[in-house]
Amino acid sequence: MLIKDANKIIVSLSKPEKMPGFAYGLPAWECKTGGKLVKVPGSVCFGCYAMKGNYTRFPEIRKSQYKRLDSLKSPLWVEAMATVINSERVSKLKVFRWHDAGDVQDLDHLNKIFEVCKLTPQITHWMPTREAWIKDHLNRCPDNLIIRLSMTMIDQPAAGSWPNTSTVVTTG
């Protein structure tokens, strides 16, 4: 697949300023767990960064996120993502972040991410998530994908049952 054709399918990647590589973002409004937590004071999603600022100031950002979400339905999405990630522009950075905004939508989406990772073995993929059901599928996770469970509440202890976690704390 040509890169230009792959880009038509996946829509675009983002390049978060504070990250060393490219990312693929979806609309935070469609997060399954985060969409509920955004209404809960004390949760890490309360006041979600991806639901304000540039994400709302520039309508084309939100529009692109929804196009990316819709692109997941394409039977060519896995091949297209792998083509773009394997391109020199993206692969030279050696790391890729899934969901600088948004989260895994369902098992089909997770399976597609697994397939993309298998097709891009030279890349270290990083995927933060609040979708705890993914734990049931960690045994199938490719070695080059680090799935980090983000705790749902501020000052919540890390989940000991996950190999990689992240927390938000008010002190320390």
Report the location of each language-model feature.
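Class I S-adenosyl-L-methionine
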Residues: M1-G172
